[in-house]
Amino acid sequence: TRLREEGKEVSGQVNHLITINLFTTITNANFDDAIFYDRVKATLDMKADLLAKLDNKENLSEAALWTASTKEEMEAKAPLVGVLATENEDIRSLRELIIYGIKGMSAYMKHANALGYDDEAINAFMQATLAKTLDNTLSADDLVALTLETGKVGVDGMALLDSANTGTYGHPEITKVNIGVRNNPGILVSG
């Protein structure tokens, strides 16, 4: 976010790393702790590279400056920054609603990226909004407005994925299929 404020380009590699990180954490998508440690390590390495490119390092958040080199350091930090670290239940709920919206958006983006489609505005929004979920000066009203904006940009993400799918595979069309039975062995596909 700060790099963009300085007019510097954020690479597709950074955007895709963040998208994959978010996608990795969606519900029921990953149960392997080692993958999460690897993702955090890769992100911290990338963050160090990004910090080196910044001209103005003043007033960066603690999250922007934090680093770790061991699994134990990561585990020690987790309860201090996890969901329950936000005491106000209304603020916590709104932040999580926004984060889940961004995770959903990351799923659209990941699948669109796999087909060669991307959108810098959506990437920038996701990253700036993640940073805003750490901003303790935002009120519940501010977070409600951000939730609504997240929904709007989520629709943009769906549109990008639709363009990626139809641009790659064509538009769905009604197709007649034989639903009869034959004497040959076969595989039943349903769903």
Task: Annotate each predicted stretch with a short phrase.
Residues 1-191:
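Metallocofactor- and cofactor-centric catalytic cores in central/energy metabolism, strongly enriched
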